Each structure stands twice: as C-alpha cells, then as structure tokens.
C-alpha cells in the first residue's frame, strides 16, 4: 500500500485539516501519514470563532523525521502551514526526499 503524507493543521471537528485528509486518503486506498503544523480550535459560545495555535518548526521536523524513517512517500499534500518557518522546514524535507 502506498504511503501518502499530509503536512497541515489539525481541526478537532474533523471537517478540515489533517483529519479530513486522512479520511480522504483512506477512501482512495492509500495509507495516510500526518505531520501537524498548527492546531485549530473553535468556540461554540462565540459563533464558532477560530483560534489557531502554531506549532514550532522543531516539532514539525521531529514528525517529518519519523515519517520518512519508515521509507519513501509516494505523494504529499500540504494544508495550513501556520508560519514561514514551517513552510521552510517542509520545503527542506520535500527537496531532501525528492517528493
């Protein structure tokens, strides 16, 4: 089974982000891996306003090291990157792994 990676934010409602990506990957018969860049929370008491917590690039790098240690990735999808440092970190591994 091919391995596919999503580098994106997490949406606790499952309607977007990593959670939605993993469901889509499963529908297409590929094994989904994920690396989080941010966490999105929503407050139902304020009309579902969003709050985004960005994760540091050092944490993203640790996740990417874990994913790529398991062998090659057939495809990659990016979503909300959170900040410029995460974009640069993801780019480093995309180039390094030749995805």
Model-derived features with residue positions:
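Ribokinase/PfkB-type carbohydrate-kinase core domain
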Residues: 43-99
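Residue-level detector of alpha-helical secondary structure
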Residues: 20-24, 38, 59, 63-66
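Short, glycine-rich nucleotide/cofactor-binding loops
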Residues: 8-14, 82
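Extreme N-terminal starter segment of soluble prokaryotic enzymes
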Residues: 1-5
